[in-house]
């Protein structure tokens, strides 16, 4: 995944930030969102 500068405690929190970044839903790793490129 592609790390973005968004803090998280769970993967559901990353859905919108990843979409806003123009990518697909990713997951929360090391308290940061990691998105899946399209």
Swiss-Prot record:
PROSITE patterns for this protein: SCORP_SHORT_TOXIN
Disulfide partners: 8-28, 14-33, 18-35
CC annotations in GO: extracellular region
Protein location: Secreted
Tissue specificity field: Expressed by the venom gland.
Keyword hit for Secreted: yes
Keywords noted in UniProt: Disulfide bond, Ion channel impairing toxin, Neurotoxin, Potassium channel impairing toxin, Secreted, Toxin, Voltage-gated potassium channel impairing toxin
Keyword Cell membrane: no
InterPro entries: Scorpion_toxin-like_sf (IPR036574), Scorpion_toxinS_K_inh (IPR001947)
Main location: secreted
Gene Ontology MF term list: ion channel inhibitor activity; potassium channel regulator activity; toxin activity
Family: Belongs to the short scorpion toxin superfamily. Potassium channel inhibitor family. Alpha-KTx 03 subfamily.
Summary of the function given for this chain in its UniProt record: Potent inhibitor of the Shaker potassium channels and its mammalian homologs (Kv1.1/KCNA1, Kv1.3/KCNA3, Kv1.6/KCNA6) (Ki<1 nM for all channels). Also blocks Kv1.2/KCNA2 (IC(50)=26.8 nM). It also shows a weak interaction with nicotinic acetylcholine receptors (nAChR), suggesting it may weakly inhibit it.
Notes on the domains: Has the structural arrangement of an alpha-helix connected to a beta-sheet by disulfide bonds (CSalpha/beta).
Miscellaneous comment in the UniProt entry for this protein: Negative results: shows weak blocking activity on KCa3.1/KCNN4 (IC(50)=1152 nM). Does not block Kv2.1/KCNB1 (Ki >2000 nM).
Name this polypeptide is given: Potassium channel toxin alpha-KTx 3.2
Organism per entry: Leiurus hebraeus (Hebrew deathstalker scorpion)
């Amino acid at each position: 995944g592609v790390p973005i500068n968004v803090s998280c405690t769970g993967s559901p929190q990353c859905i919108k930030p990843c979409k806003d970044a123009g990518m697909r839903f990713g997951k929360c790793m090391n308290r940061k969102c990691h998105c899946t490129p399209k």
